[in-house]
From Swiss-Prot:
The keyword Heme does not apply. The lineage of its organism: Eukaryota, Metazoa, Chordata, Craniata, Vertebrata. This is Probable N-acetyltransferase 14. Keywords: Acyltransferase, Membrane, Transferase, Transmembrane, Transmembrane helix. Probable acetyltransferase. It is an enzyme of class 2 (transferase). It is a multi-pass membrane protein. One of its GO terms (molecular function) is N-acetyltransferase activity. It comes from Xenopus tropicalis. Gene3D superfamilies: 3.40.630.30. The chain crosses the membrane at residues 37-57, 60-80.
Amino acid sequence: MPFIDENQLSVREMREEEAPVVLEMLKDGFKDTENRLILYILTRPMTLLLMAVASSGLRFILNSFSVALVIPVLLTIVGLKLLLWRSPDLKQIYSYYSIGQRKIWVAVYDQDDICGCVALEPTQDHQTVELKRMSVSRWYRRSGVGTHLLKFFEDHAKKKGFRGIVLYTSVVAKAAIGLFKNCGYKVTGGWNWLGYTIVQEFRKDI
């Protein structure tokens, strides 16, 4: 955990030319969470059972135990990766968050070092905003950048008249979950996979 001078840390709107840097930072964070989430899903009893059934059927078709064992695992991994990366905002991140009240900000240290980001998207009820794309550069994690971004986000949402914040995070993102709980966010739902929660929904009134 690096020591940082909070007086040198600021948050501002992302510039168009900074989009590639932010996208790489998001991808780096995704890889960590994505791999842990896939491992979590693959080791659930129901997933193991389904893959075992699929492997048994493929053995008779392919006449190869090793190939029949590998194919269901590979198909599951590919399917999960496609599902996790199905996000329209990542294709054109700058233009997407330049429409209406959507916003994306970067945390900048020492004037030019981009060390984090967070995005805002209003929900359909116009009372709540969704916190999205919150990420901290690997070198700056656990140094207070995430807390700084979260406070900035909440302050902005309040000034714009929103009454609540909703966000979604993977169950394997322990550091993020800890941060949100410490800042007053409550679990209000989630997404399930074969009966297991893989994404938690958090909400907070502001």
